[in-house]
């Protein structure tokens, strides 16, 4: 099982950008992905195999209204890029919770275990 605290993820609207017909990861998205990779490396996380259960507790940085699902894809991609697992298709069960704001930057608590 992996349990780790990560920075609060950017929304999918800020994670990707469109250039012509192409969709790219934005500068903000690359910075977030790199931070997640560095945290996973520092914690010695190795990729999990097989079907996975992902639990996410999101603590936003402020009290603005946010959609629970607006951060998930960028979080999943950053975790896969940082090798918490091989690919986000491994996630078969997802439990996501939006908690009370945690100023000034918010955070995400992630738990990943094999099914």
How would you name each of these model-derived features?
Residues 1-115:
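Acidic, proline/glycine-enriched N-terminal capping motif
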């Amino acid at each position: 099982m992996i349990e780790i605290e990560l920075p609060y993820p950017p929304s999918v609207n800020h994670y990707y950008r469109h250039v012509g017909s192409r969709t790219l990861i934005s500068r903000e998205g690359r910075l977030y992905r790199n931070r997640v990779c560095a945290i996973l490396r520092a914690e010695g996380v190795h990729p999990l195999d097989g079907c996975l259960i992902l639990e996410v507790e999101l603590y936003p940085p402020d009290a603005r209204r946010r959609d629970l699902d607006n951060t998930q894809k960028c979080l999943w991609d950053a975790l896969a890029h940082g090798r918490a697992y091989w690919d986000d298709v491994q996630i078969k069960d997802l439990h996501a919770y939006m908690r009370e704001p945690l100023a000034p930057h918010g955070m995400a608590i992630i738990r990943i275990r094999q099914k």
